[in-house]
Amino acid sequence: MFQEENVDKRVESILSIWKEQVGVELRNTISYLSRHLEEVELMNTNGRYSILYTIKTDNGEILYYEGGNPKDEFNNEELEKSWDKIPSTIRNFYRTVHNGFYFYASQSMGLVPLENVTFFDDDEWGIIEELEEPLQIDLQTTFGFFKSGMGGYVAVDYKNSNNDNATLWWTNKEPRYNMNFWDIVDEWIVIGFEV
């Protein structure tokens, strides 16, 4: 793909991977990228390859997103133990599209690399003591795959993840349970493009 000198062909090539692998799950993201993706470039950072996406917004601002290499070594011990229990659509994204896709400057507003997926049982969540309703996830089986950069996570409790069920988790307000993982992720990525 990166031996291709024509930028439009490189862009179309990467978008074809997205369409083939997550065309339903991330349809709004793909639609936005189809209209706004200006360039894709191969990056090598300390021997790790990734793709830098150059996105031009409606107001002319240039944003950079990074898509990690799906062939990267798995570097998250807790997640690796439970990987086969994570919904197949999520595993498919990480295996075939990218090991994370996020706003380059903040490394947020997107799906984080596997090494940065949050294992909820490792963190202190002060919000738990303040919840009005009983906690509906098990911290020992919950992982945050998407970080908003402002205290928001899209998290999956693999004990309750049928049909890509997820929790919209906040560090400072009530969580929202039984949400569709891909609906939230797709919407939040596009919001990140437009902010």
Language-model segments: which ranges?
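A recognition module on extended beta-rich or small alphabeta surfaces enriched in W/G with H and D/E
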Residues: 135-139, 143-195
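A surface-exposed partner-binding patch
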Residues: 1-152
